[in-house]
Amino acid sequence: MYAIIMTGGKQYRVSEGDTLRVEKLPAEVGEKVVLDKVLAVGEGADLKVGNPYVEGAKVTASVQAQDKAPKIIVFKYKPKKNYRRKQGHRQPYTQLQIEKIEIQ
């Protein structure tokens, strides 16, 4: 069984036991989170699509880690004008372990 969920403005295809990184969620490590924005649920050839969400469907996950992604460098410059700006950014994320996909 798989589900397509939406969190942090992005969509993910998940199955039970999957590990995925999503945009930072306000939860502690080890805590359970319920993702109720389920766009579709499928098993084999059977697919149930929501409008926009599937009624009574929810995905339960546990928080494995709260961390930051590797640093990216943002560098702006204007040639011949001695204008240079260097900035780094590390995007925070939450790592989830999918435990259960339920549909009623």
Curated annotation (Swiss-Prot):
<dbReference type="GO" id="GO:1990904">
    <property type="term" value="C:ribonucleoprotein complex"/>
</dbReference>
<protein>
    <recommendedName>
        <fullName>Large ribosomal subunit protein bL21</fullName>
    </recommendedName>
</protein>
<dbReference type="InterPro" id="IPR028909">
    <property type="entry name" value="bL21-like"/>
</dbReference>
<dbReference type="GO" id="GO:0003735">
    <property type="term" value="F:structural constituent of ribosome"/>
</dbReference>
<comment type="subunit">
    <text>Part of the 50S ribosomal subunit. Contacts protein L20.</text>
</comment>
<dbReference type="Pfam" id="PF00829">
    <property type="entry name" value="Ribosomal_L21p"/>
</dbReference>
<dbReference type="GO" id="GO:0005737">
    <property type="term" value="C:cytoplasm"/>
</dbReference>
<dbReference type="GO" id="GO:0005840">
    <property type="term" value="C:ribosome"/>
</dbReference>
<keyword id="KW-0689">Ribosomal protein</keyword>
<comment type="function">
    <text>This protein binds to 23S rRNA in the presence of protein L20.</text>
</comment>
<dbReference type="InterPro" id="IPR018258">
    <property type="entry name" value="Ribosomal_bL21_CS"/>
</dbReference>
<dbReference type="InterPro" id="IPR036164">
    <property type="entry name" value="bL21-like_sf"/>
</dbReference>
<dbReference type="InterPro" id="IPR001787">
    <property type="entry name" value="Ribosomal_bL21"/>
</dbReference>
<keyword id="KW-0699">rRNA-binding</keyword>
<dbReference type="GO" id="GO:0019843">
    <property type="term" value="F:rRNA binding"/>
</dbReference>
<keyword id="KW-0687">Ribonucleoprotein</keyword>
<keyword id="KW-0694">RNA-binding</keyword>
<comment type="similarity">
    <text>Belongs to the bacterial ribosomal protein bL21 family.</text>
</comment>
<dbReference type="GO" id="GO:0006412">
    <property type="term" value="P:translation"/>
</dbReference>
